[in-house]
Amino acid sequence: MRIGTRWLSYDIHGKLRIKSNVVVVNQYFLSSEAREVPDLVIYVGDFDHDRIQELFDEKLSVVYRRGGVLRSKVLLAGLTGRTILLASTPSYRLLRKPGKRLRALIKAVIQIKLIQRGLTYVHSACVCRDSSAAMIVAPPETGKTLTALMLTRSGYKFLSDDMSLVGLGRVVYSNPSPLTIHPIHVETCGLKLGLAKRVEMSLRHKLRSIPYVLLTVDEFRMSAFEVVGERDIAERARVDAIFFLEEGKEYVGELDPEEALKRLKAVGKMHRYLFENEFLQTYAYYNPALDIDSLAAREGKIYEELVEGTRLFVVRSEKRKFWRLVDSVFRRS
């Protein structure tokens, strides 16, 4: 590690403290309390692999091309306790940012640390009134973001847009990551964008409609603080209703808990990296103290509690106008 490295400290609701020299979670969790010993240290850059490796008993290390511009090395240690992840990759050396595979590994390690502390991510949006939360579940491009934003403009508080952070007891914690914004969000929600942002959004939206080009152009994103406002972001609430969105003729119906659990597990784990990560599976092979099945069971318990204690609904609507139905049902339930 280099002397003078600029470190970022994160505190995820007092459950997980991270120290990293690269951005690993959204800015909402940035903390100035650097005195606390971190649960997870992440360092991306050059390091003395052999020297550091000697310090740990429980570890997994991979080294490719020890010399040259394309050299790559990773060391992961202490995954069942205080954890350190060190990585040096060509993408960071050349572009100063982690590549796709390394980003996936970082996210997977963070997910393990959260599950160990009784939390997990669910691919969903969440809003709340007082301490009662509505979880909005749907595949991508169905209307979760639009529904959450419109409900926020109707007096609800915002908790999350794409990935909800949920714990035991159906507690959902704020996770206001940057929002993907499309023209429909601007038009329907009345979002006020400056000229530069409006042009950028329109250009990105058009480019991503072209086959193959979309693979090279990122979606237009805005901070949740810009879109929603800090005062309208709640810290936590309890999930009391889950709404499964579907496109179709307007309809609201209750859902059986068994079917709801299957749906929640199917769509709720989208954009997840944990149990399919080959590096972590190999780590578990060499370090049996990391019990993957036990982690999956802990996560499963959180999912089961969500459907056992809440009201469950299928909501269908055309043109993504789900928010009126969700609002009406949630106020009654």
Where are these predicted regions, by residue range?
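Conserved glycine(s) of the Walker
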Residues: 142-144
